[in-house]
Amino acid sequence: MNKYHNKKTVNGSIAFDSQKEAQRYTELSLLEKAGVITKLELQKPFELIPKQKGERAVKYIADFYYFDNEKNCFVAEDVKGMKTQVYIVKRKLFKYRYPDILFMEV
C-alpha cells in the first residue's frame, strides 16, 4: 500500500497502481471488444508546459486514453481516489491545453 492506501494490483500481465484502476481496465477492455470504444491506451503522456531552458516539461499522464465511438471523441480518463493539489492544477492545464479531448474522472 502507498500513502493513499491503494494496493498495487496485477491484471493479466499489466501492473496497476490500484484495484480500482485494474477494474476499470477490465471494463474498458470489454467495451473495446464490444466496439463501443477503440484505440485504448494506458498511461498516455500529455505535455502541459513545454520544456524551457533549465526546466523540464510538465506532463500529465492519463490512466486511460481511447476513442469513444458513441460520443465521437477522444477521452482521457483518470481513476481517482485522492485529489492532490498537483493533480487539480494538472487537470485544469489539461482541459485548457486539450479542449477537444473529453476529460473524465472515474
Annotated model-derived regions:
Residues 1-106:
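Electrostatic, structured charged patches in enzyme active sites and in nucleic-acid/phosphate-binding
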